[in-house]
Amino acid sequence: RSFFYPLRFFFCEGPQCALPLVALNYHNVEIRIHWATAASNYNVECFANYYYLDNEERGQVASRKHDLLITQVQKNIASGTLVQELTFNHPVKYLASSDTTTDGALTSPTNKVKLNINGLDVSNYKWGKPHFIDVTSYYHTNFVTSPDFFLYCFCLSTSSLQPTGTLNFSRVSSATIMSESMNINDPIYAVNYNILRVEN
């Protein structure tokens, strides 16, 4: 029996996002994966796709500076209270959290949540489901496989490689998600943009 799990790093999103390994010829590129103990029962292999260049193209890629637009994932540990401080940096395209049980504060159909930026409410309290699950998935994603996936978007499209909107958390004094009646017990993730510069 065999399984296929695509790794969703920024350089896996398409040919235009590939790492210019020719320009990194004096550096190692490593992928470190920490598996749970149950993974020791499996034989795991990792495969990569390469784009081959002729000698002239290789010289051009190796000699010039590359500024790559990349995405990163940041994580906030759950506060266990009604207020969750968001201590993120960089331009964030969306916030996400997931809870497959019925008692997740952000994904519950019986709890309301709101976002507060610099002491100002972005909106009134809204039901976690449908406002931050069904509605945001419909308008801002191509597909979401989890039925209980909290999503707060600052972008028009979560799957677009180019920015379609962000909130720059580096310029924000304070940001919080507030729950009306249930403690926030799930971590919150932020997907942000950054620039990776490669130069010789």
Model regions: which residues?
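Flexible assembly/topogenesis modules
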Residues: 1-200
